[in-house]
Amino acid sequence: MSDEKYNAKLDQAGGKLKEGFGKISGDKSLETEGKVDKVTGKVKEVIVDAKDTVKGLAKGLDNKDK
């Protein structure tokens, strides 16, 4: 797993924790912040996956030309 993907997963996990603590404590602001962190982490993960796919396609096309 790349560092970028690992960090995206950490963002998602941290967001889940914040959201949970926000729910338990009744802190809507913390809960919302956690939800935002989760979504941000997921978006980062999707971007990393897309970059990996493009790199793989480019590499495949490179090998096809040889």
From Swiss-Prot:
Pfam families: CsbD (PF05532)
Gene3D superfamilies: YjbJ (1.10.1470.10)
InterPro entries: CsbD (IPR008462), YjbJ_sf (IPR036629)
Domain of life: Bacteria
SUPFAM superfamilies: Hypothetical protein YjbJ
Family: Belongs to the UPF0337 (CsbD) family.
Protein name: UPF0337 protein spyM18_1212
Organism for this UniProt entry: Streptococcus pyogenes serotype M18 (strain MGAS8232)
